[in-house]
Amino acid sequence: MYWLLFLFFVHFLRHGLCDTSTRSNGSGTMNPAGINITNSTYMNATWQSNSLSHELAVRSQRDIMSNITIDQVPFPGINLNSVLFHKAFIVNNNGSHLPFNESIAFEYFQNIMVYGAQSFVVDIEVGMNYSWVLKETDVLLSDLLIQMRNFISATNNNLYGNVLMLLLRVDPTIKLASARNKTIYNSRLNFTDDLFNKFPNLNITGILDNTIGRSFIYTPSDFLGTYDPPYSIDNSTNFWPTLGALMYGRRKRLLAMEITNSFDALESNYIFTNHNLTYDVGNVSISCPYNRDQFISASETTFKFLEARYTKSEVEMYSGCGYSPMIANRFDSANITALIDLLAPAVVWSWAVGQPILTVSVPRKTSDLVAENCAAFNFAYNNFSANWFVENCYSKKRALCRSDKQIFNWTATNVKDSYFEMDGYRGETKCPNTYSFSIPRTPLEQRSILLQFEASQFNDDTLWIDLNSISVSNCWVSGGSYASCPYQRAVSTRNFVAMMVPVTVCSFVLLMMALYFSLFRIPIYDNRYNWRRVVNNYSKTEVDGVPS
């Protein structure tokens, strides 16, 4: 009986208070289910699993961009041929090169996706067996896509899901070996239905179908078939869906685009042509926006990528200019972990390093009001930078406000107050007329704030922004102090008491009944010997046999 009561309480506490699908890797960090990102070492390179703060930062950025059209969402990524899939990638402890091992490269590829890289440019060519392979390797494109499918399947939930970009750079030249003299002849293929029928391994549509799966791919026919309403706050005049509509409405996880111009849309109806993106390579003249008109113009350009060999400061700068950096630096198995530091400013463009800090319990003896559940925008004038930090919601600060008419116009409130007084929930807002309490939702918007504050000689300050984890700790949402967490059910103190009272009363009654039956036994059960004697005496009076 006591064990039943105990199990009942455990079941209630586990399933009645929290509704979450997170899974722990056993080391205190939350990782996508099914993806092995435990610390792995190979040739002096150790890849550390993500910290919980990093995962919260990436998730909060994704969520605040849910109303941004996908062509304006940053997709930081890498050139797979330069970073992983090249003949000099595998080295031993002495620095000597070893034969290429694609299983090791695939392991790091999974780790890079888990860290937060979202776009991958792949140089492909036709191999000797008329199959698509990564250029200058024997790695099949289909094997690479299977790795992407495994990641998509393992992260196909609201906690870890995100959209990936596959960018194909196609070399249409095929190298044919003569059987007689082993001479290599070059021939340029014309991709037609007849060629695909003769060599099905060259049919990109079929490869994507058999690896990723049609249900996960957002195709040109999806784009042309139905238009999602432009719920975004940017000035884009196109009809690309918002990130939220693509992920949660259509449940799509991959866009495939071609950088070159080898495929006709009719032969590959799963791939967007290069007319849908801006892809620059190397030391090109890149202009960053500096005024409102330039910011608006930048926001009207779809899918801007810049592939180059970067430094960390350049990754941060070009991210702020509205580009998705495509890192083409050469790495090997000994220094591949340095890619994390290079990707970091693009993967987490908002929060400071180590932020958001995890919410901890507040000592009960304190007399001050403390709630470390609100985000603040920390502007530094001298080094032209800004990062987000977790602050006490009851602290008095000014707030960041966005113009209701011009999305790249910003200001700050004149008065300082707690976070709870800034969102206008009580009918009053501290922001000026035609301005609203807001938050920068892309690196481009964050850069517009920096330039505007710099031009107005705005002093170093920390401003409230529309982001908090008030409803559920460590679940960061925008929409004011009463915004709810989509991943957990929040239970207030009042509701918790209301839920616990009937359970406690019922449990107390059951406990009293158990005590009663254990202390005051039934008389017949307690006097078993006397009862057995009465039965035996009665049996003696009965007549044996059949009466005559």
UniProtKB/Swiss-Prot annotation:
Extracellular side: 19-495
Glycan attachment sites: 25, 36, 39, 44, 67, 94, 101, 129, 181, 190, 203, 235, 276, 283, 335, 383, 409
Endpoints of the signal sequence: 1-18
GO biological process, alphabetically ordered: cellular response to hydrostatic pressure
Alphabetized UniProt keyword annotations: Glycoprotein, Membrane, Signal, Transmembrane, Transmembrane helix
Compartments it resides in: Membrane
Keyword flag Transmembrane helix: yes
Top-level taxon of origin: Eukaryota
Segments on the Cytoplasmic face: 517-548
Primary location group: membrane
Classification via Pfam families: TIM-barrel_MTC6
GO annotation, cellular component aspect: endoplasmic reticulum membrane
Residue stretches spanning the membrane: 496-516
Membrane topology classification: Single-pass type I membrane protein
Family: Belongs to the MTC6 family.
Function: May be involved in telomere capping.
Name of the protein this chain belongs to: Maintenance of telomere capping protein 6
Source lineage: Eukaryota, Fungi, Dikarya, Ascomycota, Saccharomycotina
